[in-house]
Regions:
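Sensory modules in modular signal-transduction proteins
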Residues: 2-27
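Conserved hydrophobic beta-strand signature of PAS-family and PAS-like sensory domains
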Residues: 31-32
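N-terminal capping loop/helix in small sensory signaling domains highlighted by a polar->aromatic N-x2-3-F motif
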Residues: 35-39
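PAS-family sensory/regulatory domains
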Residues: 47-68
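PAS/PAS-like sensory domains
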Residues: 70-74, 81-90
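PAS/PAC sensory module
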Residues: 75, 89-93, 100-106, 122
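Output-coupling edge of small sensory domains
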Residues: 109-111
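PAS-family sensory domains
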Residues: 117-128
Length: 131
C-alpha cells in the first residue's frame, strides 16, 4: 500500500466520525475508503470490498437513471470530479450489494491539496426520501 498524502489521511479520519455517507478515491479513481454510513446504503462493509479500481466501483452498484438506463461511469459525479476537477451533483439509482435498489443523491468534489496537488476525490451521498 502506498503512502497517502496527509490531506487524504485527514479526509478519511474525518469521514470515520461523520454520520454522512462518504466515499473517497485516489487520483486514479481507485476506491480507498468509504465510511460506516455509506456501508448501509452500498449494502456491504468496506472491510469486505476493500479498495477497488474505478472501473469496478463505477459499475458494481449498477447505477441507473430514473428511466432505468445504465449510467456510464463518465456520467457519475465522482468520476466527473476527478476527471474534470470540479464539483458535480446528480440524483440516480444504485443496486446495493444487498440487492436493494436505492435512489441516491451524490455531491462529489475533487480533493486538491496545498500547492494545487491533485489528491483524488470525495463523494458525499444520501438516500433520497420516499415520502
Amino acid at each position: 500500500m502506498s503512502q497517502q498524502e496527509i490531506e487524504v489521511i485527514l479526509s478519511r479520519h474525518l469521514a470515520e466520525y461523520l454520520a454522512m455517507p462518504i466515499f473517497i478515491v485516489n487520483p486514479d479513481g481507485d476506491l480507498i475508503f468509504y465510511n460506516e454510513p455509506a456501508e448501509a446504503i452500498l449494502g456491504t462493509r468496506y472491510s469486505e470490498t476493500g479498495s477497488m479500481p474505478a472501473s469496478e466501483w463505477a459499475t458494481k452498484f449498477q447505477p441507473t437513471d430514473h428511466e432505468g438506463k445504465t449510467l456510464p461511469p463518465e456520467d457519475l459525479p465522482l468520476v466527473i470530479a476527478i476527471t474534470q476537477r470540479h464539483p458535480a451533483h446528480k440524483v440516480f439509482w444504485i443496486r446495493g450489494m444487498d440487492g436493494n435498489m436505492r435512489e441516491i443523491e451524490v455531491t462529489a468534489l475533487p480533493l486538491i491539496g496545498q500547492a494545487d496537488r491533485f489528491l483524488g476525490g470525495i463523494a458525499l451521498f444520501w438516500e433520497r426520501s420516499t415520502k
